[in-house]
């Protein structure tokens, strides 16, 4: 879950993935089956586990913790898994290079219940609740930049605060009926509600100075100005619906699957957001005046977005697919073909998406699997895509479209008597009817028009295994490019063009003291091309073609985390004695050092416009 109105990386909160509840996670960069929905990019499937006996686990740290418990009846007919998490990143955020009071609090609760009535009927329920509160009171911020010949210093003084709230509730109740070994029916009833509030009123005054490179003494100020940012944005999203799925398996190697889904949506959006920039007696943007004269016109807002929208559309989708496993000589083959159709009555659009997958596992001494998949995929529009630059919902918006081809290889092998797995995926996507967007910090704002096309290609690799006997580690690397062509002006990098990324998780321990462990997490990624100052057109709206004239990439992202831990109890290698301690499956005490080398990373630039020179300073 990620809030819709989020604009700052500090507001993101916790991932919906709770490691205490998840059994397995499957990720695909594309080319997935028809039953997995309408998405143009990637697919993430999360499988929850069922406990087999009573269990209790917890984790505590200086920024929060989590507590989870699992229950199971003696006959295993009823199982329950419950988990709650809390996080407050005060200690981390207040170490930033700025005088700001932060009070971010994130909490959530998840539950997974199962009850097997008999061999034919089973019930289950998944529930999720989260509440994110983000309060920020900025005071002072100072940044030194420039060159040795022209050192600059920006001092910003703030007044006001930001107070945001994000609440989310969702649940799915499932009835599963299996009359015999060949047929299986599943009925899901689900509900979802998301309530978000983004309120801020912050006035800021800045002073841009230069210094004598020899003496270090300040010289006359370049610019003095002020800015007021104001927003009262509210969003309420409610979705209710049902889904019926059926699978027919005439034999263990063949599946026919069909599904129908009905959703009733309710979106209520109220937006009132504006920004005023002022400098020495005039506001910007401003009309041209002669040097030394003041602009006699009234203050003009740099931008103003206001809109009130309330829609209650209906979305219907269906899919059918066929899967088959068989032998071709000594080679194992898997094929899947399917088609998916969806209709949304808000824009009265129907989309049809054919897809196919083919995999072969040769009878080689090497354990390898090759897979090719592809099809036509759509990104069905929702709240962000349908909202235009005036704050209104656009009923003429269309689904973004892509044609995809994905090649994949899995290679399992042994090295120094330890098991390893290498996965590699190559993909190419030709995209059409794209909606241009820009990124302000982590906020994505769409233009509301299908006036772009593009393409993407890349390679992902991951090596997983026991680099050190008994503990798992992994290394991953990827290279990808994403381009778009807005109104036929030529190819340009999209704001999320990732390029190169490398990450590693490595675990080790002392041979004589295996209970003493250390882990190292290393991440490096090229900076995104979203470091461009947001340019406004004559109507005060973002100019999505401005990057054709100027585009700046953010600095590369670099981070190293180090963890130290002592395993007191491990029922596999370090069993505990005593009636009480023997009940513990694992007991570990550890210290995690985030960003161990204190590397400063840039998620986004805050651009300051020097009206005297016309330059933008990041």
Model-identified regions with their sequence ranges:
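N-terminal periplasmic accessory domains that precede
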Residues: 10-15, 30, 34-55
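Transmembrane beta-barrel wall of Gram-negative outer-membrane proteins
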Residues: 63-86, 99-138, 162-191, 251, ...
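Membrane-embedded beta-barrel scaffold of Gram-negative outer-membrane proteins
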Residues: 184-190, 197, 399-457
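Structural signature of Gram-negative outer-membrane beta-barrels, strongest in the C-terminal barrel
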Residues: 237-239, 251, 261, 302-429, ...
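Gram-negative outer-membrane beta-barrel transporters
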Residues: 326-331, 428-430, 449-535
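C-terminal beta-signal and adjacent terminal beta-strands/loops
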Residues: 470-473, 523-541, 566-618
């Amino acid at each position: 879950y990620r809030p819709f109105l989020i604009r700052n990386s500090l507001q993101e909160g916790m991932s919906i993935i709770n490691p205490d509840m998840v059994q397995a996670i499957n990720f695909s960069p594309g080319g997935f089956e028809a039953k997995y929905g309408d998405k143009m990019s990637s697919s993430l499937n999360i499988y929850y586990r069922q406990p087999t006996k009573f269990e209790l686990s917890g984790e505590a740290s200086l920024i929060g913790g989590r507590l989870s418990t699992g229950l199971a009846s003696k006959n295993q007919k009823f199982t329950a898994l419950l988990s709650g998490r809390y996080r407050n990143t005060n200690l981390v955020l207040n170490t930033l290079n700025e005088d700001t009071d932060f009070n971010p609090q994130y909490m959530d609760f998840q539950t997974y219940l199962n009850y097997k009535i008999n061999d034919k009927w089973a019930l289950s329920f998944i529930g999720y609740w989260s509440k994110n509160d983000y309060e920020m009171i900025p005071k002072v911020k100072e940044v030194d930049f420039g060159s040795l010949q022209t050192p600059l210093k920006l001092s910003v003084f703030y007044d006001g605060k930001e107070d945001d709230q994000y609440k989310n509730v969702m649940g799915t109740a499932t009835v599963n009926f299996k009359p015999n070994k060949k047929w299986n029916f599943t009925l899901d009833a689900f509900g979802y509600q998301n309530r978000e509030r983004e309120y801020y009123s912050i006035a800021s005054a800045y002073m841009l100075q230069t210094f004598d490179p020899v003496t270090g003494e300040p010289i006359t100020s370049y610019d003095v100005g002020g800015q007021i940012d104001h927003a009262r944005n509210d969003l309420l999203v409610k979705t209710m619906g049902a889904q019926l799925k059926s699978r027919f398996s005439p034999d263990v190697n063949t599946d026919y699957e069909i599904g129908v889904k009905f959703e009733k949506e309710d979106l209520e959006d109220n937006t009132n957001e504006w920004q005023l920039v002022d400098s020495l007696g005039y506001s910007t943007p401003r009309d041209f005046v002669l040097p030394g004269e003041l602009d006699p016109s009234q203050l003009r807002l740099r931008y103003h977005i206001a809109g009130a929208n309330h829609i209650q559309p209906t979305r219907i989708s269906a899919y059918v697919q066929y899967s088959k496993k068989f032998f071709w000589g000594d080679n194992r083959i898997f094929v899947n073909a399917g088609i998916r159709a969806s209709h949304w009555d808000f824009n009265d659009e129907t989309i049809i998406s054919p897809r196919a997958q083919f995999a072969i596992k040769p009878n080689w001494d090497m354990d390898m699997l090759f897979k090719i998949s592809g099809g036509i995929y759509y990104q069905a529009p929702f709240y962000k895509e349908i909202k235009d630059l005036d704050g209104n919902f656009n009923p003429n918006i269309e689904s973004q479209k892509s044609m995809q081809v994905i090649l994949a290889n899995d290679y399992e092998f042994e090295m120094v008597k330890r098991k390893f797995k290498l996965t590699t995926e190559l993909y190419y996507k030709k995209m059409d009817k794209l909606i241009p967007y820009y990124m302000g910090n982590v906020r994505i704002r769409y233009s509301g028009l299908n006036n772009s096309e593009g393409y993407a290609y890349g390679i992902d690799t991951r090596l997983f295994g026991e680099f050190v006997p008994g503990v798992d580690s992994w290394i991953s690397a990827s290279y990808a490019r994403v381009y778009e062509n807005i109104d036929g002006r030529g190819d340009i990098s999209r704001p999320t063009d990732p390029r190169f990324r490398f990450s590693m998780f490595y675990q080790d321990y002392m041979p004589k003291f295996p209970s003493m462990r250390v882990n190292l997490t290393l991440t490096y990624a090229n900076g995104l091309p979203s470091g461009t100052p947001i340019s406004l057109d004559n109507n005060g709206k973002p100019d999505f073609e401005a990057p054709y004239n100027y585009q700046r990439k953010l600095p590369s992202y670099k981070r190293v985390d180090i963890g130290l831990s002592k395993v007191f109890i491990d029922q596999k290698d370090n069993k505990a004695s005593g009636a009480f301690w023997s009940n513990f499956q694992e007991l570990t005490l550890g210290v995690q050092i985030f960003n161990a080398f204190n590397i400063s990373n840039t998620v986004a630039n805050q651009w300051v416009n020097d009206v005297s020179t016309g330059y933008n300073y990041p």
